[in-house]
């Protein structure tokens, strides 16, 4: 199984990460503001930065409050982009401004890294249940690789386009 990095462990991200751990996935987790000892006690590895998460993961998922946080976490100083492994896939599950998503995607593409924009709907109860709706856009091959992972967090997982 691929090692998954998970950045953003708030209201939505924490239960999503928990569902991945329960499904047997190895996670490396980080949140700039929230503590994540509970996830470490379930078997996740804690990281001290976005860059460290990327350096230890093959698939990096972000679930952050808004566009500025996503941009900072992925392409900002000390961000995911600085620690990427060859062949990594970045999946942003936040609901953000499409222009920021395109900017992040272009920066990752320049590093030869696949990017999926995969926002969710369903709110905290569905995040806890693992029954979110996930609508992704991006590279089809990358989507097919991460789809089994996304299916541990959602029951409706579709690729809507590139």
Predicted feature descriptions by range:
Residues 10, 33, 64-67, 98, ...:
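Alpha-helix N-cap/helix-start capping motif
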Residues 4, 95-162:
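Rossmann-fold dinucleotide-binding core
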Residues 17-18, 41, 72-75, 102-105, ...:
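Short amphipathic alpha-helical segments
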Residues 1-55, 59-62, 88, 93:
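NAD(P)+-binding Rossmann beta1-loop-alpha1 motif at the extreme N-terminus of oxidoreductases
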Residues 50-114:
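Rossmann-fold NAD(P) dinucleotide-binding segment
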């Amino acid at each position: 199984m691929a090692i998954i990095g998970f950045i953003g462990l708030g209201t939505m991200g924490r239960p999503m990460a928990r569902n991945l751990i329960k499904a047997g996935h190895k996670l490396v987790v980080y949140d700039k503001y929230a503590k994540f000892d509970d996830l470490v006690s379930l078997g996740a590895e804690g990281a001290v930065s976005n860059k460290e998460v990327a350096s230890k993961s093959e698939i990096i998922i972000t679930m952050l409050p808004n566009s500025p946080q996503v941009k900072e976490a992925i392409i900002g100083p000390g961000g995911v982009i600085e620690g990427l492994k060859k062949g990594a896939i970045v999946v942003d599950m936040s609901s953000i401004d499409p222009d920021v998503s395109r900017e992040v995607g272009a920066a990752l593409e320049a590093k030869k890294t696949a990017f999926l924009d995969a926002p969710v709907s369903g709110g905290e109860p569905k995040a806890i249940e693992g029954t979110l709706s996930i609508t992704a856009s991006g590279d089809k091959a990358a989507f097919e690789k991460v789809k089994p992972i996304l299916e541990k967090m959602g029951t409706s997982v579709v690729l809507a386009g590139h």
